[in-house]
């Protein structure tokens, strides 16, 4: 395991995946469209990561470079690399798929028959499987069988809070991250040897961990943000230190947790400890994480497979308590942010067609369901 191409040189790319790879002595080439960022990374070939938990420490990440992801350079790197990773955001996966497909085709053309593994590290369920579908659309059909044999598309679950850099910091490459991190990969999807990277955990039951993170960290995070916005709090820490919000977020995570316990057999006490750990992470005094960063793109977050509605569907499936999850969805409908196109679209829909039709459109819940009626009642009370 010698080198990797990582798409996305943003905060998560540099502060999480890129750092773990570099710490494992992998030479990392970042690929990004941000020209000044690429220029600085390729010039300096190192950057600082401020790791904040009970104490602060600054690590220097070395042996890195960068190329423009819209250039031929990145395709040439894919020809020779051992690993491709991404942290670009779910919406950008479809855009980079064409580049990855070109890289795979050129790799085969060059006679490189070494296995290649690709891991999308995104906040989405089975993100790499989605990426594979997009890559294959751009890959000549005659190469599909060979790609099936030699290219592993490895799904993963990732968890680390990486807020935007503080504006006062004069080093544009420095990134702040929390000390907690979790990167879990599906060991059944690799081709060839599984790379040994400290901090990358292997499992044969990925969905349990994907949903544990989605239903706990992501569900709790966005409900903290939406309830915080309604109370006028600016940051996640301010919001979670509000006793009423703390109690409701904890209750929401316990409601979604009951689904996980029934579905995957998680231990009740251990899952409650996991919830407490996440509440502690939200209150990290060193992380300035604004509610608007966590609350943005509410339409995506209200999707049937995302952090609010998916756990709700689980409570319906198992017949368990869901009152606070319903309130979280109602709070999401109240989210306003003029700089976020999805928030604007959501508010426009509420004005034009009302709560019931808006919920049906974006969540997939039936207009005549009890849940939609309850959410509407809660919405009117907020």
Swiss-Prot record:
Gene Ontology cellular-component annotations: cytosol
Domain of life assignment: Bacteria
Keyword Heme in annotation: no
InterPro entries the UniProt entry points to: 6-PGluconate_DH-like_C_sf, 6PGD_dom2, Mannitol_1_phos_5_DH, Mannitol_DH, Mannitol_DH_C, Mannitol_DH_CS, Mannitol_DH_N, NAD(P)-bd_dom_sf
Organism: Vibrio parahaemolyticus serotype O3:K6 (strain RIMD 2210633)
Keyword Oxidoreductase: yes
Residues reported to bind NAD(+): 4-15
A GO MF label: mannitol-1-phosphate 5-dehydrogenase activity
Pfam families tied to this protein: Mannitol_dh, Mannitol_dh_C
Keywords: NAD, Oxidoreductase
Catalytic activity line of the entry: D-mannitol 1-phosphate + NAD(+) = beta-D-fructose 6-phosphate + NADH + H(+)
EC number: 1.1.1.17
Lineage: Bacteria, Pseudomonadati, Pseudomonadota, Gammaproteobacteria, Vibrionales
Protein name, as recorded: Mannitol-1-phosphate 5-dehydrogenase
């Amino acid at each position: 395991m010698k080198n990797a191409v990582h798409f996305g040189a943003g905060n998560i790319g540099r502060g999480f995946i890129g750092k773990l790879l570099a710490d494992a002595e992998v030479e990392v080439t970042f690929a990004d469209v941000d020209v000044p960022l690429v220029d600085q990374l390729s010039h300096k070939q190192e950057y600082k990561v401020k790791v904040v938990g009970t104490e602060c420490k600054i690590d220097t990440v070395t042996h890195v470079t960068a190329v423009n992801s819209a250039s031929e350079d990145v395709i040439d790197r894919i020809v020779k690399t051992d690993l491709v990773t991404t942290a670009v955001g779910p919406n950008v996966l479809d855009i980079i798929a064409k580049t990855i497909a070109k890289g795979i085709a050129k790799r085969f053309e060059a006679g490189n028959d070494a296995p290649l593994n690709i891991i999308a590290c995104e906040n989405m369920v089975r993100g790499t499987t989605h990426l594979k579908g997009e890559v294959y659309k751009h890959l000549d059909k005659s190469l599909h069988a060979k790609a099936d044999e030699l290219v592993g598309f490895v799904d993963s679950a990732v968890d680390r809070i990486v807020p935007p850099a503080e504006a006062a910091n004069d080093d544009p490459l420095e990134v702040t991250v929390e000390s907690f991190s979790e990167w879990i990969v599906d060991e059944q999807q690799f081709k060839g040897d599984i790379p040994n990277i400290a901090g990358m955990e292997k499992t044969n039951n990925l969905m349990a961990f994907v949903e544990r993170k989605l239903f706990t960290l992501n569900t709790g995070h966005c409900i903290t943000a939406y309830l915080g916005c309604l109370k006028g709090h600016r940051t996640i820490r301010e919001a979670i230190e509000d006793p009423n919000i703390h109690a409701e977020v904890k209750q929401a995570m316990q409601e979604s947790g009951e689904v996980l316990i029934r579905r995957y057999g998680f231990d009740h006490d251990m899952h409650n400890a996991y919830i407490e750990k996440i509440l502690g992470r939200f209150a990290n005094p060193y992380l300035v994480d604004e509610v608007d960063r966590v609350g943005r793109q509410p339409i995506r977050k209200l999707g049937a497979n995302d952090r609010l509605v998916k756990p709700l569907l689980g409570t319906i499936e198992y017949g368990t308590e869901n009152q606070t999850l319903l309130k979280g969805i109602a709070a999401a409908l109240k989210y306003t942010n003029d700089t976020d196109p999805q928030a604007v679209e959501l508010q426009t829909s509420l004005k034009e067609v009302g709560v019931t039709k808006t919920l049906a459109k974006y969540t997939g819940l039936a207009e005549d369901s009890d849940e939609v009626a309850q959410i509407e009642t809660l919405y009117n009370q907020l």
